[in-house]
């Protein structure tokens, strides 16, 4: 069985997440061994939150779940590519389709290139 080399990377492996239908890059996150095993077993993208220090099933709060369509591993076994079906239209916790919604202009300023899919204040209120 192919497994990411968690030992080489200090226990966390980066994951680039891409829309399987369009090729759009949605986000970058990290997984540990438990998140890897949970993702394989459930078919839903499960990551490890470095700030909360716990597993995080993408979309469990917002409903914007990522269904795994394909997983690829790089030649060094230390980076993954999740190709997903993005349910609900937004991968970013700030309400955008992609976490890469800001274009950096030549002068160093930022320009938002996407419309918000949802209002985070409404979705994540406690």
Curated annotation (Swiss-Prot):
Catalytic activity, EC: 3.5.4.19
GO molecular function: magnesium ion binding; phosphoribosyl-AMP cyclohydrolase activity; zinc ion binding
Residues engaged in binding Mg(2+): 74, 76, 78
Chain positions recorded as Zn(2+) binding sites: 75, 92, 99
Single GO biological process annotation from the record: L-histidine biosynthetic process
Cofactor(s), names only, from the UniProt record: Mg(2+); Zn(2+)
Primary localization: cytoplasm
Protein's UniProt keywords contain Protein biosynthesis: no
Subcellular location: Cytoplasm
This protein's record includes keyword Protein biosynthesis: no
InterPro entries: PRA-CH, PRib_AMP_CycHydrolase_dom, PRib_AMP_CycHydrolase_sf
GO CC annotations, alphabetized: cytoplasm
Catalysed conversion reaction: 1-(5-phospho-beta-D-ribosyl)-5'-AMP + H2O = 1-(5-phospho-beta-D-ribosyl)-5-[(5-phospho-beta-D-ribosylamino)methylideneamino]imidazole-4-carboxamide
Pathway(s) annotated for this protein in UniProt: Amino-acid biosynthesis; L-histidine biosynthesis; L-histidine from 5-phospho-alpha-D-ribose 1-diphosphate: step 3/9
UniProt keyword terms in alphabetical order: Amino-acid biosynthesis, Cytoplasm, Histidine biosynthesis, Hydrolase, Magnesium, Metal-binding, Zinc
Cofactor note: Binds 1 Mg(2+) ion per subunit.
Subunit architecture: Homodimer.
Protein family (similarity comment): Belongs to the PRA-CH family.
Classification via PANTHER family: HISTIDINE BIOSYNTHESIS BIFUNCTIONAL PROTEIN, HISTIDINE BIOSYNTHESIS BIFUNCTIONAL PROTEIN HIS7
Function description: Catalyzes the hydrolysis of the adenine ring of phosphoribosyl-AMP.
UniProt name for this protein: Phosphoribosyl-AMP cyclohydrolase
Gene (UniProt): hisI
């Amino acid at each position: 069985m192919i497994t990411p080399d968690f030992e080489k990377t200090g226990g966390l492996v980066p994951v680039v997440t891409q829309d399987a239908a369009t090729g759009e890059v949605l986000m970058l996150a990290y997984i540990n061994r438990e998140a890897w095993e949970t993702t394989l077993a459930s078919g839903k993208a499960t990551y490890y939150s470095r700030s909360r220090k716990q597993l995080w099933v993408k979309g469990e709060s917002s409903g914007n779940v990522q269904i795994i369509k394909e997983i690829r591993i790089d030649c060094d076994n230390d980076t993954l590519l999740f190709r997903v079906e993005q349910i609900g239209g937004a991968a970013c916790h700030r309400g955008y389709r992609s976490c890469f919604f800001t274009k950096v202009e030549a002068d160093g300023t930022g320009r938002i290139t996407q419309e918000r899919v949802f209002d985070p204040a409404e979705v994540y209120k406690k």
